[in-house]
Amino acid sequence: MTATRLDGNAVAADVRSAVAAAVSALPGQPCLAVVLVGEDPASEVYVRNKVKMTEAAGMVSIHHRLPADTGQAEVERLIESLNADPEVDGILLQLPLPKGLDADAAIEKINPDKDVDGLTEVSAGRLSLGKPGLRPCTPVGSVILAKRALGPDLSGKNVVVIGRSILVGKPAALLFLAENCTVTIAHSKTADLANVCRSADILVPAVGRPEMVRGDWVKPGAAVIDVGINRIPAPEKGEGKTRLVGDAHYESCAEVAGFITPVPGGVGPMTIACLLRNTVLAACARRGWTVPEGL
């Protein structure tokens, strides 16, 4: 068996198209405010991509850039001013922050109704309780990819999420539970991890350990949604060169699985697409607009 490759770029493009169609049907333009502190090169690229895709979807993008020596109070004052701005629907604080700043404290200043990353404690509580709210983007993207593989109804599927992080593992487990899946959260203390993984119809490795999941861990025909992104040495490319791999060993897993996401080009592209989707959902909830069909 050779797994079908789940192209995250293609699925993300579909989500962005649905977002653009939804925006065109709204009575106004949703607005996303992005806050970047410092000059981290990777963050600069991420923010440029987010701004570009936000505007391409027909939404308003506001970009606030603060110097690296900005104090905690100034960051939090900016967030509070964006909370109070009736034109702003979503607030994104680009991470990581420069050393000396408390990211958790800054995130907690974001109004949960504008928390398009789904990272505040209130957003986490709403997810846990099954209340309406904004969900973390990477876990949402993982569920969308699983549905693209196995169909829109995931009821009864066995899901194993490897990893219990607050950013991916726990919210992914809760989102699959909301789809009526039977969910196991595995972690570093799980006994016989390989055997646990072999029970999964949907396997979601999210631990940041390069190529940990091997083909003999995978149930034949399963969907492997690889959230991991790791940089490892690639001497075949030349001295000092590296390459990106996931938490699953792609070649061996692809021989057994029915579907598998590549790294890069799998879950990663879904994150920005789901951020745009969250911005539309936040705007509709805040402004009393009906959510357009197709989101």
Curated annotation (Swiss-Prot):
GO cellular component: cytosol
InterPro entries cross-referenced by the UniProt entry: Aminoacid_DH-like_N_sf (IPR046346), NAD(P)-bd_dom_sf (IPR036291), THF_DH/CycHdrlase (IPR000672), THF_DH/CycHdrlase_cat_dom (IPR020630), THF_DH/CycHdrlase_CS (IPR020867), THF_DH/CycHdrlase_NAD-bd_dom (IPR020631)
One Gene Ontology term of the molecular function aspect: methylenetetrahydrofolate dehydrogenase (NADP+) activity
Pfam name, any one: THF_DHG_CYH_C
EC number, as in UniProt: 1.5.1.5, 3.5.4.9
Similarity field: Belongs to the tetrahydrofolate dehydrogenase/cyclohydrolase family.
Subunit structure: Homodimer.
Protein name as annotated: Bifunctional protein FolD
Natural source organism: Hyphomonas neptunium (strain ATCC 15444)
